[in-house]
Amino acid sequence: MDIKDPIHGYIKLNDDEKELLDSPQVQRLRRIRQLGLSSQVYPGATHTRFQHSLGVMYLAGRFADSLNLDEDKKQEIRTAGLLHDTGHGPFSHASENVAEKRDIDHEDISCNVVDQLSGKINSDTDRIKKIIKGELEIGQTVAGDIDADRID
């Protein structure tokens, strides 16, 4: 399956990624603004976490290609890129203080989503969670100082 992205062109998804994309946990990202409340001031600031997550998945895959990683690691990185923001609440970072009061962050919640979707993920879910948290060296492609998340 291909998805047309205004920035990255056609993004290819394999069957596993399509199944994750169709999950309620990922589909809800269509209703969460990437820039939080900025769209209230800047009408053009309307892109969503869904669009962003597709871009991060794509860029993470490009990083994996550049690093000559094997297909298993590439799939782990792409999956982490797709799911890395599923833990965001309404209005994105503007609502993070609610989670912080419970001593959790959106990455923790995203890791819980990985657990919820584990039956649809044909990769090592523990490694995917570590990539989301930036705990593995290859996690720097998704959760580092210069990463697919910040580039998108």
Show which residues each predicted segment covers.
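Sequence-structural signature of the catalytic-core scaffold of metal-dependent phosphohydrolases
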Residues: 1-32, 40-78, 87-152
